[in-house]
Amino acid sequence: DSLGRLVNNNASESHISLKINSNILRYNFSSSMKLIKTETNRYIKAPTALYIPPREMFSLFDGFISLYEKREVSFDETYLDLAKALNAAPLKGQAYERSIELIQPLLDKWNIQVVKKNNRFYIIEEGKEYEAHLVAEGLRKMATMLYLVINGELKENSILFWDEPEANLNPSLISVVAELLVNLAKNGIQIFICT
């Protein structure tokens, strides 16, 4: 019920020390405190972490953020986080060029682009444009990865948690996904896969 209840009943104060990337944050508080005091006044920037759930989000994106924030829905908050990450516009200039380098192994094997128009995603494959909900789920998962890279949400020092990347994926694309993940890891993205 209160911050002070975190303090052991026999102790007068609690001390917490947190080390992130060789930066240390220290906190002290007593059983009567309502606010925490920090011993240091530094902000430590945590790496961006993205979780991609087993069910794809691409075809659900249009209106999902508003729906989630205003109504009871049977999706957990990780879907909202992913929708917000997908909501960012693509990078431009050198940042965009750098993002393309991260996904180049995939683009070399598969002529695909992902665009967002009027809050809907479209997948352009071999010059033909398809609405996201009209293509196979495995293709939507790949398009999600591509878009997260080109909009800068998945970048160096990011952490990616991908649950069942192989689910509903065309078997011929599994090696392409593996190459993409290896290339992302080589470029400083930490990857956790659950299958």
Descriptions of predicted regions:
Residues 194-195:
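H-loop/switch region of ABC-family ATPase nucleotide-binding domains
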Residues 159-161:
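Walker B motif beta-strand of ABC-family P-loop ATPases
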Residues 176-181:
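Conserved hydrophobic alpha-helix in the ABC-type ATPase nucleotide-binding domain
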Residues 163-165:
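Walker B catalytic acidic pair
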Residues 1-157:
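Phosphate-coordinating catalytic segments in nucleotide- and nucleic-acid-processing enzymes
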